[in-house]
């Protein structure tokens, strides 16, 4: 198993801003005609529990765990796995930081959970204020794609 792994607990997304037009996952779906609607992938939940060697998991990259159609109970299951596997580091990035900040108090934020926000242009720098309020020990900003 590699040291850095994409953990696809959800797949698909929905266009939210101009930055989405450059998303590799979205572009792949356009090219192939694949369904890009948000889908839960519960069969992936146990993946981090299968290896005790420390890994870095990119959580739902190319998707968004905090998309409005992802149920709270499902997000809680994802957090339970992250909390129960402290040997791993988890990187969550979202454009839907408002929802993440509203739900944040419902989760346990162990130190291995890093929260990030995508800010693809100055038009979306307001997302940073929401990120600052998040209870994660490590926060990051993604500027991809930078428009």
Q: What role is predicted for each listed range?
A:
Residues 1-113, 122-124:
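Conserved Radical SAM active-site core
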Residues 117-147:
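Histidine/lysine/aspartate-rich catalytic loop segments that bind and position anionic ligands
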